[in-house]
Amino acid sequence: MKELYPGDQGIWVQYLQLALQRAGQQVMLDGIFGPKTCAAVEKVMGSSGKCAVKEAQWNRLLPFLRGYITHEVKAGDTFFSIAKMHNTTIERIMHANPGMDAGALQIGSTVVVPLNFPLVSEEVLYTSLLTGWIIEGLMARYPYLQVGTIGRSVMGTPLWSLRLGNGPVEVGYNASFHANESITTPVLLKFVERLLEAYADEHMYEELYPERLFEEYSLYLVPLVNPDGVDLVNGLLTEGFYYRRAVRIASGFPDIPFPDGWKANIQGVDLNLQFPAGWDMAKKIKFEQGYNRPAPRDYVGQTPLSVPESIAMFDFTRNHDFSLILAYHTQGEVIYWKYLDEEPEGARRIAEYLSLIHISEPTRH
């Protein structure tokens, strides 16, 4: 964890401010460690005149980013008293501890205590770090959520996969193929959180019952396909070998703003152009446009499937029998439903339906 001091700016400060907000402090999520943020740190920590954030302070604040704590049961404890102690609800505690007898808590046992706020924020920039905290928190809140990895990125970051349901029909979702499109990651994570919450509370979600959905379908989600690139764009990666190499790559394309215009993985390969289908055609087009070497965007790579993220997504897709895949992007405001002359059965109907509930327009690819 990065040590923070007054005057610091950036993504780490924004995460600090998010934790402070959830701890009850009135601070803006502006990423600037100013006087109000300093005062909030002092108040939460109970230490006047000391607003540096080091390991001990982060350890106090991390539960507000992961969304839960653990409580060791003592004599006389009940779910009600534990909920009151930590300002949360009995229902949240029960959902997180499905195998525990609420009427006979064992002294010394550990209770997972979800804190009483939505876990997936829509107000901060996303990185691999925040995504990992959220996934950990979702697992704690909803222990029946199935979590795994499909591989690792160039820098060794896990490529997380989430599974909801155990039905025979498989549906795939993914987000943040492109580094500067990370707003798609909280879209998927918020979908997961709301669906799990509705399932736990036995409520309907968007006119359907999650229990029935999970019996008929298995939903597989990869919320952060390009973690290294996202970390670069959103300010988590600011030094070291990979950062310096990205700077060198970007210097060859001065018309593309750095890092905001970076779409590729950390090696300068556009993951969305890495798949065997149409690769030769894409190579011809992109090379003619000047993207014939590692670049912030549109470089197809030396060969198809030449970087770990695209290989992981390719293998993951081949290992499943997806009836539908939804790949979330930004910038275009269109829904691609057809690839060249290949049109999956029902694809246009699905795209037209989605266009009715979103601002995007259906279009061929």
Which residues fall in each region the model found?
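Active-site/substrate-binding loop(s) of hydrolase catalytic cores
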Residues: 168, 182-336, 344
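Intrinsically disordered, low-complexity Ser/Thr-rich linker and spacer segments
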Residues: 47-50, 55-72, 113-126
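Short, solvent-exposed alpha-helical surface patches in non-cytosolic proteins
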Residues: 35-46
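Short beta-strand-to-loop junctions in surface cap/lid or active-site-entrance loops
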Residues: 161-168, 176
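Primarily a LysM-type cell-wall glycan-binding module
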Residues: 1-35, 63-87, 109, 115-118
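Residue-level detector of conserved catalytic or cofactor/ligand-binding positions
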Residues: 355-365
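Short glycine- and acidic-rich boundary segments immediately preceding or forming the N-terminal edge
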Residues: 114-155
